[in-house]
């Protein structure tokens, strides 16, 4: 009996579940053979995947390091402490909680710690580049709180901080949120701090999309200006899928510990926390700063070339990893554009643009991001070609010869920049 159980837990995935093993391999092949331009995605290191796929998966560890409700936590305590220390060092924070399962969970913990149901929160309108957790009516943030939204200025498609200030003075929110999912310009955290102080509001920065750029110093940091900062650990930070909360004030930060556990989560995912620690360690290396600079340079090349080809870009360019195409300029919807590029092995996503006449299910925009392909080694020249492939496909959607050429160019680009040279999946071997 004992031998039988040991045999089952030591079996390779290909033997124990060939269906799942096969699907994982198909997904690996898809990632290798497609151009990944979804702005919220990236390719994490094999070291991160090894940590996440380790025996730490087996360990329950409710509570904080050295304050657990379970025994046998001495090693996960050390791992979590490393993750906390690295997060603090990377972002210049006095306090960090590495337990949130996602960015949404991190935001919810902040709401739980700082607000009461019925309080007023102020964040960017989702259709202008905000996020579901910043007060969308379909999210708990939009159900529990009174929500007021600010947006970009119609002509520049950028934030007008005086308009944000006037709205805050009128509505007097308890919490102001800055940080977005589809805003390609630099965020003026100091200006938001001034507005929050003027109306007596807490200031939350959700830097999920730009955390890697902040860590590398290529985007201003919110830490010194905001009461609390949340982020995901993937996207531009290039770690596992998860969340993180940071504070400049350790005493203030500790109130979020209880909001995470037991307020909104049970046991932390220590295998994911280990992977976060690995990714944070990677981001502390000089190479990561070089990578992040290239992410922004590539986005600017992509935006510039797309515009040269006659397709409008929201706000006229980008300061970060995001490029948002305004397809009204060529009489196309985001839904159609998403399908067209997917047919030539480019993954992106349809997205609303400011003052979009289309529904969120159709949209007038296509959101692109450069973080993942930069990880593969794509440089300025390669991204110029990526821009041309996208433009060729969108500008001549009915031309089958152009479609075939685009497919071949994508195949060649993927071949020039292989992803995982030594495939990490020992269980699949």
Curated annotation (Swiss-Prot):
Residues given in the record as (6S)-5,6,7,8-tetrahydrofolate binding sites: 126, 130-132, 359-361
Gene3D superfamilies referenced in this protein's UniProt entry, alphabetically: Aspartate Aminotransferase, domain 1, Type I PLP-dependent aspartate aminotransferase-like (Major domain)
InterPro entries: PyrdxlP-dep_Trfase, PyrdxlP-dep_Trfase_major, PyrdxlP-dep_Trfase_small, Ser_HO-MeTrfase, Ser_HO-MeTrfase-like, Ser_HO-MeTrfase_PLP_BS, SHMT-like_dom
Gene Ontology CC annotations of this record: cytosol
UniProt record, GO biological process: glycine biosynthetic process from serine; tetrahydrofolate interconversion
Family: Belongs to the SHMT family.
Job description of the protein: Catalyzes the reversible interconversion of serine and glycine with tetrahydrofolate (THF) serving as the one-carbon carrier. This reaction serves as the major source of one-carbon groups required for the biosynthesis of purines, thymidylate, methionine, and other important biomolecules. Also exhibits THF-independent aldolase activity toward beta-hydroxyamino acids, producing glycine and aldehydes, via a retro-aldol mechanism.
Name used for this protein in its record: Serine hydroxymethyltransferase
Organism whose genome encodes this protein: Prochlorococcus marinus (strain MIT 9313)
């Amino acid at each position: 009996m004992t031998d039988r159980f040991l045999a089952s837990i030591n079996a390779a995935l290909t033997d124990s579940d060939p269906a799942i093993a096969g699907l994982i391999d198909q997904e690996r092949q898809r990632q290798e053979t497609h151009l990944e331009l979804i702005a919220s995605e990236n390719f994490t290191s094999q070291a991160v995947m090894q940590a996440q796929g380790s025996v730490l998966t087996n360990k329950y560890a409710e509570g904080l390091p050295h304050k657990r409700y379970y025994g046998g936590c001495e090693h996960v305590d050390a791992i979590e402490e490393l993750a906390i220390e690295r997060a603090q060092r990377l972002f210049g924070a006095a306090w960090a909680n590495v337990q949130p399962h996602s960015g949404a969970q991190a935001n919810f913990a902040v709401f739980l710690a700082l607000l009461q149901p019925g309080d007023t929160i102020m964040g960017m309108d989702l259709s202008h580049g905000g996020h579901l957790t910043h007060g969308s009516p379909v999210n708990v943030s939009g159900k529990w709180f009174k929500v007021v939204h600010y947006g970009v200025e119609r002509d520049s498609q950028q934030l007008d901080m005086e308009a944000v200030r006037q709205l805050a003075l009128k509505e007097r929110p308890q919490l102001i949120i800055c940080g977005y999912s589809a805003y390609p310009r630099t965020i003026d955290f100091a200006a938001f701090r001034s507005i929050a102080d003027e109306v007596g509001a807490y200031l939350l920065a959700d830097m999920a999309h730009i955390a890697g750029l902040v860590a590398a110093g290529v985007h201003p940091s919110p830490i010194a200006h905001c009461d609390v900062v949340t982020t995901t650990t993937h996207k531009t930070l290039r770690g596992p899928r998860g969340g993180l909360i940071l504070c400049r004030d350790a005493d203030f930060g500790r109130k979020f510990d209880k909001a995470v556990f037991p307020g909104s989560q049970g046991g932390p995912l220590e295998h994911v926390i280990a992977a976060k620690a690995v990714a944070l360690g990677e981001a502390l290396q000089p190479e990561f700063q070089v990578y992040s600079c290239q992410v922004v340079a590539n986005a600017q090349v992509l935006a510039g070339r797309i515009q040269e080809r006659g397709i409008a870009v929201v706000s006229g360019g980008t300061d970060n990893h995001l490029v948002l195409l305004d397809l009204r300029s060529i009489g196309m919807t985001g839904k159609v554009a998403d399908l067209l590029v997917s047919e030539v092995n480019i993954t992106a996503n349809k997205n609303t643009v400011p003052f979009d006449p289309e529904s969120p299910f159709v949209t007038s925009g296509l959101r692109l991001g450069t973080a993942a392909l930069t990880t593969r080694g794509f440089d300025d020249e390669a991204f110029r070609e990526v821009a041309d492939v996208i433009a060729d496909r969108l500008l001549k959607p009915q031309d089958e010869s152009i479609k075939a050429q685009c497919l071949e160019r994508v195949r060649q680009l993927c071949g020039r920049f292989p992803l995982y040279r030594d495939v990490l999946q020992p269980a699949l071997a």
